[in-house]
Amino acid sequence: MSLTDTIRNTFVPIHREGYPFIAGFFVVSLILGWLWDPLFWIGMVLTVWCIYFYRDPERVTPMDDDLVISPADGKVSFVGLAVPPAELDLGYEPMTRVSVFMNVFSVHINRSPVRGKIDKVVHRPGKFLNAELDKASTENERNSVLIESPHGKVGVVQIAGLVARRIVCWSNQDDELSVGERFGLIRFGSRVDVYLPSDATVRVAVGQTAIAGETVLADYGTERGEPVVRIA
């Protein structure tokens, strides 16, 4: 094994979105340390925390169009029927929704739950209520992504929360996403909702831990052989 491979396997990758913040914390630490030595170490603790916050570990994603994979790390906080946000244009009838709540210690990178083409991306300003509240789905600031998957339209909604006030989505309309592909992040935790077609069968329960890019949230009940996976 080469030195490069050893380093890559030892240290968790950091997402590029975190580079400016990590550099900023480090520079501030140097300035504070010049004023008073103990402040340098306080600043370095915050710098390390920032590195941890923007970690972006590889995930082993099953490449199966009949599976819906978790878009976020965290706890499954809701499984049931709910009316999707109007901007998704999915109608006014309730759809199956699975919500994953991310806390401040979760990996904050969001991944596509399915393979498909993005029909639209819509950002809506709103409140910053506790993301664990059900009304946060309609009242909080959010970013809604509609994906045309092999089994129909799937809605993915990034929701800001009490602490999280910055939603990032670098994917755009007409982009093609692979299942498990990174499409955005929510700083300081919050929640991601997934709205599924009626023929999807949910495979998780409230309170269960979900891992972005790996945990199967739902499937379409078809028989399948040995799964093909992608590490990314």
Curated annotation (Swiss-Prot):
Cofactor(s) the record lists: pyruvate
Modifications the protein undergoes after translation, according to the UniProt entry: Is synthesized initially as an inactive proenzyme. Formation of the active enzyme involves a self-maturation process in which the active site pyruvoyl group is generated from an internal serine residue via an autocatalytic post-translational modification. Two non-identical subunits are generated from the proenzyme in this reaction, and the pyruvate is formed at the N-terminus of the alpha chain, which is derived from the carboxyl end of the proenzyme.
Xref: InterPro entries: PS_Dcarbxylase, PSD-A
EC number: 4.1.1.65
Principal place of residence: membrane
Keyword Transmembrane helix: no
Record-level GO BP terms: phosphatidylethanolamine biosynthetic process
Top-level taxon of the source organism: Bacteria
Subcellular location: Cell membrane
Pfam families to which the protein is assigned, alphabetical: PS_Dcarbxylase (PF02666)
Family statement drawn from the similarity comment of this UniProt entry: Belongs to the phosphatidylserine decarboxylase family. PSD-A subfamily.
Quaternary assembly: Heterodimer of a large membrane-associated beta subunit and a small pyruvoyl-containing alpha subunit.
Protein name (database record): Phosphatidylserine decarboxylase proenzyme
Organism whose genome encodes this protein: Brucella canis (strain ATCC 23365 / NCTC 10854 / RM-666)
Lineage of the species this protein comes from: Bacteria, Pseudomonadati, Pseudomonadota, Alphaproteobacteria, Hyphomicrobiales
